[in-house]
A protein has these predicted regions:
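Flexible, glycine/charged-enriched surface loops at secondary-structure junctions
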Residues: 105-109
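Alpha-helical support elements that line or immediately flank enzyme active sites
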Residues: 77-104
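Fold-independent oxyanion-binding glycine-rich loops
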Residues: 39-41, 62-64, 76-79
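N-terminal amphipathic/basic leader segments beginning at the initiator methionine
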Residues: 1-49
């Protein structure tokens, strides 16, 4: 997390990319708790992931999904969802599946 940075003076639009926030009910009810990014069809994406052998379920899922076509990126606010046991991968997949359903895209593209 960046420390000591001031607010951006201008946030320039990026063609083929949209960014938004939403309440998914992951945190407190009504709180904006996810960031949703839409990539235009045919976009190329890249990711930089931890090299740590122990990482959160959403990171593991993202590494797999980045091998195919990515249309949406989904991140939760706050701390990582690490150390969640078997429930972690299931919750990560379920959250992506719901966004895919709402967006009308393949689950593997989220």
């Amino acid at each position: 997390m960046a420390v000591g940075l001031g607010p951006l003076s201008t946030l320039h639009p990026v063609p083929g990319f949209e960014l938004g926030i939403a309440s998914a009910g992951i945190k407190r009810p009504g709180r904006k708790d996810v960031v949703v990014m839409r990539c235009a069809e045919g976009s190329s994406v890249a990711g930089v992931f931890t090299l740590n052998a122990f990482c959160a379920a959403p990171v593991t899922l993202a590494k797999q999904r980045f091998l195919g076509e990515v249309r949406y990126l989904l991140t939760n606010t706050g701390n990582a969802n690490a150390g969640t046991g078997e429930a972690g991968p299931a919750a990560a997949a379920q959250t992506c599946a719901k966004l895919a359903e709402l967006a009308g895209v393949a689950e593997t593209s989220v």
